[in-house]
Amino acid sequence: GPVGTFASVDPSVEAHVAKRLGLRPERVSTQVIPRDRHAAYFAALGVIASSVERLAVEIRHLQRTEVREAEEFFAKGQKGSSAMPHKRNPILTENLTGLARIVRAAVTPAMENVALWHERDISHSSVERVFAPDAAIALDFALARLAGVVENLLVYPKAMKANLDSVGGLVYSQRVLLALIQAGISREDAYRIVQSNAMQVWREGGEFEERLEADETVGKHMSRAELAACFDPAPYLVHIDTVFDRVFEPKKKAKKPRRKQGA
């Protein structure tokens, strides 16, 4: 067409207008910008929406009555259920899960818009008029809502500890396994010993540490003090600062501006 071939307008006009608008001319185009750019944009929105949902789903699981390690802020007078006054439903994160589906729904039609007849038909137009604003607005709203949920999130450390303690120390089985290996037992035998005792705790209850203390093989290779050290949670927190630094990337010190050299 006349636009793509520049039959009526010199390419310099396009370059001038684009520069004034803070844009760059499309390097490979016909009458329209190739829709692979649009597809990449909406695919990115879909990934962001999925990340929002990932966090929302985790909060929903943590708010379950039998877990209750964290939950959405619940205002005074707020209703969780019209029929059951005691309920504190995670309505905000449930809403975020739904919004993520809306945003992801734009990805497939965006991909399908890439293949236009002879590089230009208008089949993409009606599709983009619907999902383009819907996906962008929905994700903007979802991000704002998620920020509010995280900022006001209620966290219950005591419940976290209670949940860890509820399995009688089984969460420390890996540390016991490694300690037995270091004490000279083969990995296969150490695994069998630890698993055998762990399964008994699963079936019969009780404390994992006490079960191991009663195991003669364990007693021959580890003292009670060495065994007790395996049930110390402190080693799991040694590198917590490093983990947080990786996640939040502390701001690097601003570089001092270079001095201009004199003539």
Regions found by a protein language model. Give the residues of each.
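Internal glycine-rich alpha/beta core junctions
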Residues: 1-116
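Glycine-rich cofactor/substrate-binding loops
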Residues: 84-263
